């Protein structure tokens, strides 16, 4: 299967923060699903993606979407620590980025954080959340041209 085109993903990426009308507070996986579906090389829907979805058949979880991309479509990502030094290795690249355990949810202590984020990475910038405090336990990166 062909890898998605970064520019096509960028063009298909939703312009709104919460594209789903359901009450999901964190919609990064939904936004990435919409971009993937719009790009056309990788489809996220009920016949291809079995993890939890919103009513529109978009992925709801960042980690489950990242694992699905790894297992079924893009192969093993470059896996980095959350450090600033490691991020420099991808700073001038484009692709899909997954931040593992980058923020605390609800009543979690920061040391027990489990919040994840998936996004487009455009030469050091994302479309939404950015882990500027380098809190991620891991950063996964799939380079796309």
Regions found by a protein language model. Give the residues of each.
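N-terminal capping segments
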Residues: 1-55
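Alpha-helical interaction segments
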Residues: 3, 58-59, 131
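Acidic, low-complexity intrinsically disordered regions
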Residues: 20, 64-66, 136-138
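Active-site-proximal beta-strand/loop segments in catalytic clefts of secreted hydrolases
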Residues: 35, 99-102, 144
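General "foldedness" signal
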Residues: 46, 111, 133-135
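...with weaker cross-activation on analogous glycine-rich loops/strands in unrelated enzymes
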Residues: 51-127
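Low-complexity, Gly/Ser/Thr/Pro-rich intrinsically disordered linker/tail segments
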Residues: 128, 132-145
């Amino acid at each position: 299967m062909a890898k998605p085109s970064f520019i096509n993903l960028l063009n298909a990426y939703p312009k709104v923060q919460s594209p789903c009308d359901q009450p999901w507070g964190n919609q990064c996986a939904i936004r990435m699903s919409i971009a993937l579906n719009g790009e056309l090389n990788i489809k996220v829907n009920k016949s291809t993606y079995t993890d939890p979805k919103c009513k529109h058949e978009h992925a709801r979880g960042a980690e489950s979407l990242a694992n699905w991309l790894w297992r079924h479509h893009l192969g093993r990502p470059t896996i980095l620590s959350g450090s600033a030094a490691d991020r420099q290795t991808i700073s001038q690249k484009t692709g899909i980025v997954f931040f593992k355990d980058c923020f605390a949810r609800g009543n979690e202590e920061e040391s027990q954080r489990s919040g994840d984020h998936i996004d487009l990475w455009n030469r050091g910038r994302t479309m939404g959340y950015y882990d500027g405090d380098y809190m991620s336990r891991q950063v996964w990166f799939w380079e796309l041209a």
